[in-house]
Structures are given as structure tokens and as C-alpha cells.
Amino acid sequence: YEKVAKNIIEGALSGYNGTLFAYGQTGTGKTHTMMGSDVEGDGRGIIPRALDHIFETVEANSDKYIYELNMSYVQLYCELLQDLLEPDFSKTLTIREDTEQGRGVFIQGLSSFSVASKDECLNLLRIGHENRAVAETNMNSQSSRSHAAFMLSIERRPKATFDNLMKEGNNEGKPNTAPKKTFAKLFIVDLAGSERVKTSGTMHGQRFSELKSINLSLSALGNCISALSEKKRHIPFRDSKLTRLLQDSLGGNARTSLVINVNA
């Protein structure tokens, strides 16, 4: 957590979009990396540790800032976006972009829940995890068949304290040093495992469609990361709904980490 996630969480709390991925072949422990064996103690995964970090910071700064946190949980299954917290999978969710109010890329129709504690977030995560698509393959008895994104928007507003009001209202021509409102989107993404057709045993039917969709979206993600690292002018975010959704949290001044899980 200290090496791959802490910097991203601190950035999100200061107004920088961020994304953390768990990537690897199916059965390598990506979901365990994210959630861990327990929500307390040393067995915590990245998400419980991140939530501890976030809400401890919110509490520590409660005299200076008002925080508004909203959580969503979505899966991308065969290139279909599905709400894991209100699982009416017949409902169409659409990726939109708001340039007028500065929301950036968002999912129209996706549920969003105001959260004020780690326990509230974990309860929603449990609900979403139960609705996530899993299936047995030759490589994993509980293989995730979708990419799942835990999404947390963090808005921070300065309290109207006397000191802040004085800074905002100075008439001496000095730069305004009052705290500003910040907004950031944090994505923690459990990617479905990459698979080979022969080793997974999914040569036909729905499992094959899932595998093909998983591998295509992972390929699109790899292409975007490669283009960003090479500073190319065109980044192919629109090649997959996965990369389109994460567009604001991959490019620009966003912070991104990739945790790669491998079998020993």
C-alpha cells in the first residue's frame, strides 16, 4: 500500500484524479490484493487501507474542510456497463462527457451513494461483489468475468472560517491564498484476468465471449498506457469502454499505479 497506493490516495484528497489497477492472469490473487483476508489489521487489502487513509484524513481536517464523498461500483461485462449496487442489468448505462460543469467523463444512469465512513463503503462493496459476474474455468473455480471499478468522487470545500474570509477579502493586491475547492475522481479497478483460450477451457459459448471481451479491453488498456508513456498526440481512449471510462484518471495530471499479480 505504501509503495503503490498512498501517493494516489493523497493526490485524490488534494484534487488529483487517480487510478489503481490490479492486473494479471486469472487465479493470481488480484481480488485478494484489493480486498485482503480481513477489513482490519494486517490482513487488509488495498481498498480497506485506502478507506482508512481517506476517512482518517477527513477527520483530521474536519476543522478546515467540508468533504463530500460519493461512491459507485460498476462492472464492465462483455463491453456492457452494469451497476453493481442497483443490479438491473437490463438498464442501459452510457458513458458521457460533461465539459460545461467540469465533470469530465461519467456514466449516465449509474447509482451514486453518499458515504461518510469506511463501514458504509465496505457494506456497499460487499453488495456489489455479490452481484459481480464470476464463473468456473479450468484455471480458476471463481474466475471474475468482468472488470470491476470502485469509484469514489471526493469534493473538498474550505470552511468559512475567519482566517479564510480574511484571505479571500484582502485588498492589498496580494495573491489570494485562501484554500480552494477541489474535486477528484478515484478509481480502484480489479481487472478480469487475462486468459489463453486453450488453457482456460473456454472454446465456445458464453465463456468464450467473455474471454474475448476481457482480452480485447485489456489490449486497449495496454495500447493507451503505451501511447501515454511515449507521449503520443493521440491516445486511443475510445477503443474500449474501459479506457473511455478511465480517461480522466489516466492522462493529464492524474496519478496511476499498476499492481501486477503473477504466479510463482
Protein language model annotation of sequence segments:
Residues Y1-A264:
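Microtubule-binding structural modules
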